[in-house]
Each structure stands twice: as C-alpha cells, then as structure tokens.
C-alpha cells in the first residue's frame, strides 16, 4: 500500500488539506531546485576536471551531461527522502532500495513493451514509415530518458499525486495528477488537446504501478523506457522533442496520414493507437490495484 503520511506537516488537525498543498509546493520547488543545482555543479566539475572549455556554442560532451544528470537525480531523491523523513516524521518506504532493481526491471519492460505495441499498430496500419539509420547519441538519449523518468515521476507521483490524495482523497488525486500532466505538455512543440488527452489516458499506468508496489522505482523505469524506446530505438519525436533520436531506426509519419493516426510532430504517443493502448494499460493496472485493496492508503 502507498504511505501518504499522517504526522509532521500533514498531521491531523485544522487546515490539514491546506497544509498538504503548501507542503506539496515546497517539495516541488526544493526537489527541482536541488536537481538543477547539483546537475549544473557536477557538469561544471567534470568538464573542468577534463580540461574542456564549455560555451553556449560548444556544450559539455554528452557523457559528461549524462553523469551530471544522474548526480542531479540522486540529489533529488535524497532531498525528497530527507524532507519526508523529517518533515512528515515517518519512514520512506516509497524509496525502499531492497526492491529497487526488480521494480526498475519491471517498469523498463512495461514501458518498452507498451511503446513497441503502439508503434507496431501504427506501422502495420501504414500510418508511419520506419527506416534504418546510423546509430549515435546514445548518451544523450540515456540522459534525457533518465532525467524525465526520475524528475517527472518523483515530482508528479510522490509529491503531487500523494499529497493531493492526502488533501482530497484518491479520486481527486488521480484526476488532478492526470490533468496536470496533460496540461503541462500543451506547451511542447506540435502539441494539441488530443496529444494532451493521450497523455492523460496514460497516467493510469504510472499511478497503477505506484499503487500496486507502493514504491516509485517501477514507475521511473516505465517512464524512462517509454521515452528511450520511442525516441532512441524507434527514432521518433518524444512529446514534440527530437533530441533523443539516434538509434537504429527512424520513424516518421506516412505521407497524407492525419496526425491523429501518426502522432504528427508530437510523436507516436499522440495517436489513436497510443490512446487505445494507454487506456487499456491504465484500466488494467488500476483495476488490479483496486482488487488488491491498494486504493486505501497507509498513514504510517
């Protein structure tokens, strides 16, 4: 079961819902700020140690930026652990390392399988074209995938979803987290209300995994593998961003096919195939969590 907290800043009493929301805002700012601070500091340190001059026209090598992103992710996780341990006066089972490897592998498999299913439907239907290409940019793809998996899921799942649950209950938390995730992507290149709807439909995947395991690791693995498979392996645009492409394949919309079928410039995740796969996966995982009794939280 998910532990949502019942002591410290979220202890029972007057204005508990408001205290939970204020704590949510503080954790979001602190976590993202720590990630950025440490990532930039480590990037500067490794480039300085390597004797490399970094400018806006000549950024740090991709491997150095990968190391910096991993350091930032570790700092973000540590910041969350410390804040919850002392601010909410409880242990932090959502970051239990004893199950981290198995959970990560589970999530990686689910993310890769779901994205492969989406692209397979598109390709077999003639909605996209897939061609071979020269392999490169793996370090950059790993950096972007790990960063999005850790930062987005820790903030959205462990902070926003969990504390909305604490404040208002599980159903408002599910709706609020899903709508926020979709809305945030409306600012991405080539986004649309339909693209946001597809992402909202897929939010049940991450929420379901979190409810079932009570931990964040499988959700991080799922998100990272989804992006890496979509962007690097298939060479597709990821949420309107093309930086990850560089793997063995290059995917593009077939000529004359509507964006709603191909995903257009936003990528395969903004397509009818993605909507269908995401709804099925979200429904299956949430139903399984409900059957396991995971819609009831642990306070301590």
Task: For each feature predicted by the language model, list its residue ranges.
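Cytoplasmic juxtamembrane interface segments
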Residues: 2-9, 84-85, 193-226
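Interfacial aromatic-anchored transmembrane helix boundaries in multi-pass membrane proteins
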Residues: 183-197, 230-243
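Transmembrane alpha-helix boundary signature
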Residues: 86-93, 115-130
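Residues that define the loop-to-transmembrane-helix transition and helix capping
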Residues: 171-172, 216-217, 269
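N-terminal, membrane-interfacial amphipathic/helix-forming hydrophobic leader that caps
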Residues: 1-92, 231-300
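Aromatic-anchored segments of alpha-helical transmembrane domains
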Residues: 29-36, 115-121, 178-187, 225-233
């Amino acid at each position: 079961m998910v532990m949502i907290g019942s002591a410290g800043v979220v202890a029972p009493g007057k204005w508990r819902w408001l205290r939970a929301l204020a704590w949510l805002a503080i954790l979001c700012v602190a976590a993202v700020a720590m990630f950025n601070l440490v990532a930039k500091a480590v990037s500067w340190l490794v480039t300085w140690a390597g004797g490399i001059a970094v400018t806006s026209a000549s950024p740090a090598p991709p491997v150095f930026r990968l190391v910096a992103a991993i350091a930032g992710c570790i700092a973000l996780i540590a910041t969350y652990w410390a804040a919850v341990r002392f601010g909410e006066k409880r242990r932090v089972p959502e970051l239990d390392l004893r199950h981290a490897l198995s959970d990560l592998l589970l999530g990686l498999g689910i993310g890769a399988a779901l994205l492969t299913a989406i692209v397979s439907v598109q390709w077999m239907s003639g909605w996209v074209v897939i061609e071979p290409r020269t392999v490169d940019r793996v370090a950059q793809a790993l950096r972007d995938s790990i960063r999005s998996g850790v930062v987005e899921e820790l903030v959205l799942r462990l902070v926003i979803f969990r504390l909305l649950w604490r404040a208002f209950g599980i159903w408002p938390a599910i709706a609020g987290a899903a709508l926020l995730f979709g809305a945030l992507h409306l600012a991405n290149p080539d986004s649309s209300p339909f693209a946001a709807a597809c992402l909202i439909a897929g939010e049940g995947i991450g929420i379901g995994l979190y409810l079932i395991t009570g931990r964040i690791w499988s959700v991080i693995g799922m998100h990272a593998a989804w992006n890496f498979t979509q962007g690097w392996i298939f060479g597709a645009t990821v949420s309107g961003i093309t930086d990850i492409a560089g793997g063995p394949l290059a995917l593009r919309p077939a000529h004359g096919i509507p964006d709603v079928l191909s995903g257009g410039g936003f990528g395969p995740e903004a397509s009818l195939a993605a909507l269908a796969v995401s709804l099925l996966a979200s429904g299956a995982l949430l139903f399984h969590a409900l059957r396991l009794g995971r819609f009831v939280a642990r306070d301590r």
